[in-house]
């Protein structure tokens, strides 16, 4: 069966990272808790930014979209994971697996692009403050976000289309949490050299280019901060970047743990690293921004308690 006639009835088995019923119950409650915390945290960030006029700035516009992306990202994978923990039927259809993979690739790429745009926003705000209003106009912000969405959608479609050219035969058992590109290539019985080369080439180009852009931006930001005469001003300026820098470090650190390795060395032990980038990073982002950013201090809490306040 080739990529053209993978039947709609074909399916994969998402066996997860443990087949022990006791461990699956523990994993169920752990992932359910993490999912609820992630949803609550990111929804509160979005509501706080949309309801507070003081936060209607380019930086928080992109932060709200980053939270939306993280919310969509965990919803793409965790609900199916939770169902599998509680069910004997762990099957996922071929189309369902490709759909999950498409959104996974697109949303990881979108996260990366938004983080790069946020780095540019901080660079303009700190290194070119007199031009900030014109350089980060509302129209340009919408255009940049549209480009981020467009590129991520196209990249997801490209890799998903290439995967439809791959043949799967024999046991389609995925000892993993969700349909991941590396795992599916690992299960393939046809030649995956072309798609693997395309995955490495495009992935390195996109992610390393944007990482290089962010690194260059922060080098210039740090240089500008060091030239400031006042220590208090240096601290205040750097604190506006600390949250973003923390999120970037967490995002790239966990992503590198999973994907910066040859395909033949990829094994199920990488599930721990996958949990970190697929679940822990979206969960931690709201806390990082809320705790490290002065403008966001208490903002999610105010949204949460607003219905209980007297008019």
UniProtKB/Swiss-Prot annotation:
Tell me which InterPro entries the record gives. Answer: GPCR_Rhodpsn, GPCR_Rhodpsn_7TM, Olfact_rcpt
Disulphide bridges in this chain? Answer: 97-189
**Which PROSITE patterns does the entry link to?**
G_PROTEIN_RECEP_F1_1 (PS00237), G_PROTEIN_RECEP_F1_2 (PS50262)
Which Pfam families does its entry note? 7tm_4
User: What is the protein's name according to its record?
Assistant: Olfactory receptor 1D4
Q: What is the lineage of its organism?
A: Eukaryota, Metazoa, Chordata, Craniata, Vertebrata
Principal subcellular localization: membrane
One example of a Gene Ontology biological process annotation: sensory perception of chemical stimulus
Q: Which UniProt keywords apply?
A: Cell membrane, Disulfide bond, G-protein coupled receptor, Glycoprotein, Membrane, Olfaction, Receptor, Sensory transduction, Transducer, Transmembrane, Transmembrane helix
